[in-house]
Amino acid sequence: MLLTTTDVLQGREVERYLGIVTAEVVYGTNVLRDFLASLRNIIGGRTRTYEEVLENAQKKVLEELEQRAKRLGANGILGVSIHTNMSATMILVTAAGTAVKLR
């Protein structure tokens, strides 16, 4: 499966557009992790705890997007975008793209 943020893949031709695919991953926040992250923010530096959560969420959302595209018979997804939203109680990562059958 080829995923790209662009609308075309150089050297590949789109045989058929199969539709928009979307995926979502939601993680609840953790009180201890939040406390440790806030301490890190006070003394400065990166909060690796949240970076790891976001990294994992992005990986999972792309895996889910790929699975949904495969169910449509796609072997590529064009125009992939990933968005992250955080609130006091959750982290939401969404992804979307156009499933295609490439030659």
Swiss-Prot record:
Cited InterPro entries: UPF0145_dom_sf, UPF0145_YbjQ-like
Pfam families: YbjQ_1
Record Gene3D superfamilies: Hypothetical protein apc22750. Chain B (3.30.110.70)
SUPFAM superfamilies: YbjQ-like
Transmembrane feature ranges: none
Superkingdom classification of source: Bacteria
Classification via HAMAP family: UPF0145
Family statement: Belongs to the UPF0145 family.
Entry protein name: UPF0145 protein CYA_2258
Gene source species: Synechococcus sp. (strain JA-3-3Ab)
